[in-house]
């Protein structure tokens, strides 16, 4: 979203005459909206060098996308989803950073391109509303069973996707095809000389830049993250025994002699993680309780807890998190990385035994209390969490498309000719 925002509005212009092109439930889509989106799509396709479909086909596709977005926007409005100015300002700041600018520079860039910063904010606000609608209507309903996780972990696909990954760099000393034995021996001596320099502490990246014939030499030999199964023999069997920072002895390959360095590894191995025991109260804005009223209620509950009332009892009475309310808001021991950023940040900043002030996340208003912290070997748990994440993402894509078809079928849509 952020990287494309500048070009998204890049050709906005005043349309002297406007008309309704579609009625969508209680709202309408105007010709000017359709024309602007068509210009954006044209610009995107041209930048990619992609062929443009026939104009009538493209117009139909873009109008259908606008209809689906409009339906989701109306669902958000009816559900009381509101984006505060603070959240919107934070989102705009993030977009500016992704474009390598300060917020002021970003505003100037928009103005220079003839764009309205207010229009840009409104587009981002709509996208945030739609994201939260999808979170509530689709993501929160997805369930992954323990049996599904077990089946995935036992499958070949699961083993491949969750196996250990290695960040590698290499140095290649080339050997031409049909090389003589003298040439091969000279290359072997050169590779062995470099290996000895590395064992004595020479910088791998510098040697790669100056001596490697690989196409990644100027990047210090970096080849990125790889799984063992993605490596050619014999590296696939060698890599597991290396410690981070180790280099292999020169290995003869069809292209020459290769020295491999293990820069970093992740997944698969023993993993010690910090866990936090936390409980919270969640209050969600809705059609019958506005954003301001929800924030006010959160503040009142915070004051009541500070005055000595029992956190757990108030959570049972007021919290709208179905997974924890009946347990007094207790989320038990949890990996901070499994939480949304806003919740994680406040939790990390709250001392053990202390209460946070009310704060907002994408789910609503929270009050949290940190009950304990510990470090634990969570290798197996982490693999299970990874499996859940893979399965949830897979289900989400399927469920989202089904839900979009459903709301489109249920909506009243009249397209004007």
From Swiss-Prot:
Signal peptide start and end residues? 1-12
InterPro entries in alphabetical order = OMP_Chaperone_SurA, PPIase_dom_sf, PPIase_PpiC, PPIase_SurA, SurA_N, Trigger_fact/SurA_dom_sf
Where does it primarily localize?
periplasm
The alphabetized list of GO BP terms reads:
chaperone-mediated protein folding; Gram-negative-bacterium-type cell outer membrane assembly; protein stabilization
Q: Does the keyword Protein transport apply?
A: no
Protein origin, superkingdom: Bacteria
SUPFAM superfamilies from the UniProt entry: FKBP-like, Triger factor/SurA peptide-binding domain-like
Q: Which UniProt keywords apply?
A: Chaperone, Isomerase, Periplasm, Repeat, Rotamase, Signal
Reactions accelerated catalytically: [protein]-peptidylproline (omega=180) = [protein]-peptidylproline (omega=0)
One family from Pfam that matches here is Rotamase
Question: Residues in domain PpiC?
Answer: 163-264, 273-372
Gene3D superfamilies membership = 3.10.50.40, Porin chaperone SurA, peptide-binding domain
Q: What is this protein called?
A: Chaperone SurA
Q: Which organism is it from?
A: Pseudomonas aeruginosa (strain ATCC 15692 / DSM 22644 / CIP 104116 / JCM 14847 / LMG 12228 / 1C / PRS 101 / PAO1)
